[in-house]
């Protein structure tokens, strides 16, 4: 399979095909500050977007990759970027390397570079909060996204897994039949932020469905942030997961820095040795020219981090509840499709 690094990003849509920034008239007066019509019937704003991201087809290198950009293109996530390789933002799915760079840069901006807020919105929509990490998405509006197509619960969960798994590593997915909603937990928050924008107002129909041509008549998925699980055991597991994620990130960054720094030092030392001792054996000289170990880049330090990570993993496994005992937000979430 070809990596996105081996190709240029695709132009997802022509500029002439982009919708107007002014919404359809639903009132008497247009407010230029809020980009909304007032003094009229608001109507149903739910719809199925005519644009959709296809990660394998659309991903590729952009001008942002060459400029060292950290943030991703919001319009790429929505499937409607008209710049392609000329875009100043990234056009691929966030991976571990991107997540490590974002974590070092800031915690108050999302993966698109937008400022987060102190608290979540009342309806759990929007950009999110910088106070708490949230990797779980609530997925509603499933009936409208299927154009009322009747499917078994296992089939619905399978479709949710298919469309969301393309947008990052999934921790777990659960479909709650009684409330006709689903929950998708990603391994990293940046992937959850990306998927929330990419899957909002998208259909769950597939090209093989006979209803595919009429998909625009549906209302699309409603994707929001999931509420925090009030269960103390679940909160403890969450803290352990965050601690383990931080340790994983530290090991990943230290390994990368050690490898890159070691390569650079060796190259410089070899150049110096070639100029100074072109013919003599220089094994002893190489040892004297190597930098002193500061303790942070040694194998012992990395091994200690890995041991701590293993201990946390064992505690996490031993504290997990049995399969038959389910609870938390997967069953107690009060939102519905009509939110």
Curated annotation (Swiss-Prot):
ZnF region ranges: C3H1-type? 67-94
Q: Does the keyword Zinc-finger apply?
A: yes
Please name the InterPro entries in this protein's record: Cwc2/Slt11, Cwc2_RRM, Nucleotide-bd_a/b_plait_sf, RBD_domain_sf, RRM_dom, Torus, Znf_CCCH
Print the keywords alphabetically: Cell cycle, Metal-binding, mRNA processing, mRNA splicing, Nucleus, Phosphoprotein, RNA-binding, Spliceosome, Zinc, Zinc-finger
Matching entries from CDD domains are given as:
RRM_cwf2
Q: Which GO MF term does the entry hold, naming one?
A: pre-mRNA binding
The record's subcellular locations are: Nucleus
Q: Which GO terms describe its biological process?
A: mRNA cis splicing, via spliceosome; mRNA splicing, via spliceosome; positive regulation of cell cycle; positive regulation of RNA splicing; spliceosomal snRNP assembly
Q: Which Pfam families has this protein been placed in?
A: RRM_1, Torus
Summary of the function given for this chain in its UniProt record? Involved in the first step of pre-mRNA splicing. Required for cell growth and cell cycle control. Plays a role in the levels of the U1, U4, U5 and U6 snRNAs and the maintenance of the U4/U6 snRNA complex. May provide the link between the 'nineteen complex' NTC spliceosome protein complex and the spliceosome through the U6 snRNA. Associates predominantly with U6 snRNAs in assembled active spliceosomes. Binds directly to the internal stem-loop (ISL) domain of the U6 snRNA and to the pre-mRNA intron near the 5' splice site during the activation and catalytic phases of the spliceosome cycle.
The free-text domain note is: The C-terminal RRM domain and the zinc finger motif are necessary for RNA-binding.
Q: Which family does it belong to?
A: Belongs to the RRM CWC2 family.
Quote the protein name from its UniProt record. Answer: Pre-mRNA-splicing factor CWC2
């Amino acid at each position: 399979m070809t990596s996105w690094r081996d190709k240029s990003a695709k132009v997802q849509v022509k500029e002439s095909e982009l919708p107007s920034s002014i919404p359809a008239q639903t009132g008497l007066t247009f407010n230029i500050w809020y980009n909304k019509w007032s003094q009229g019937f608001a109507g149903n704003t739910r719809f199925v977007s005519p644009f959709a991201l296809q990660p394998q087809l659309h991903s590729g290198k952009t001008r942002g990759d060459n400029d060292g950009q950290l943030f991703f293109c919001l319009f790429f996530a929505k499937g409607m970027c008209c710049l392609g390789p000329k875009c100043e933002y990234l056009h691929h799915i966030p991976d571990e390397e991107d997540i490590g760079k974002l974590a070092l840069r800031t915690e108050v901006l999302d993966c698109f570079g937008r400022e987060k807020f102190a608290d979540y919105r009342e309806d759990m929509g929007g950009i999110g909060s910088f106070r708490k990490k949230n990797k779980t998405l609530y997925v509603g509006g499933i009936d409208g996204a299927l154009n009322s197509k009747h499917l078994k619960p296992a089939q619905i969960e399978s479709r949710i897994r298919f469309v969301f798994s393309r947008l990052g590593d999934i921790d777990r997915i659960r479909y709650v039949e009684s409330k006709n909603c689903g929950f998708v937990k990603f391994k990293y928050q940046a992937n959850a932020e990306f998927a929330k924008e990419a899957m909002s107002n998208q259909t769950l129909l597939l090209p093989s469905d006979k209803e595919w041509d009429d998909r625009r008549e549906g209302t699309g998925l409603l994707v929001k942030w999931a509420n925090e699980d009030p269960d103390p055991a679940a909160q403890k597991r969450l803290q352990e997961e965050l601690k383990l994620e931080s340790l994983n990130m530290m090991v990943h960054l230290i390994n990368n820095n050690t490898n890159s720094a070691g390569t650079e030092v060796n190259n410089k030392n070899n150049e110096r040795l070639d100029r100074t001792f072109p013919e003599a054996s220089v094994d002893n000289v190489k040892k004297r020219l190597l930098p002193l170990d500061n303790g942070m880049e040694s194998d012992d330090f990395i091994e200690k981090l890995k041991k701590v990570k293993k201990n946390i993993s064992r505690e996490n496994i031993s504290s997990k509840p049995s399969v038959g005992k389910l609870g938390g937000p997967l069953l107690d979430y009060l939102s519905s499709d009509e939110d």
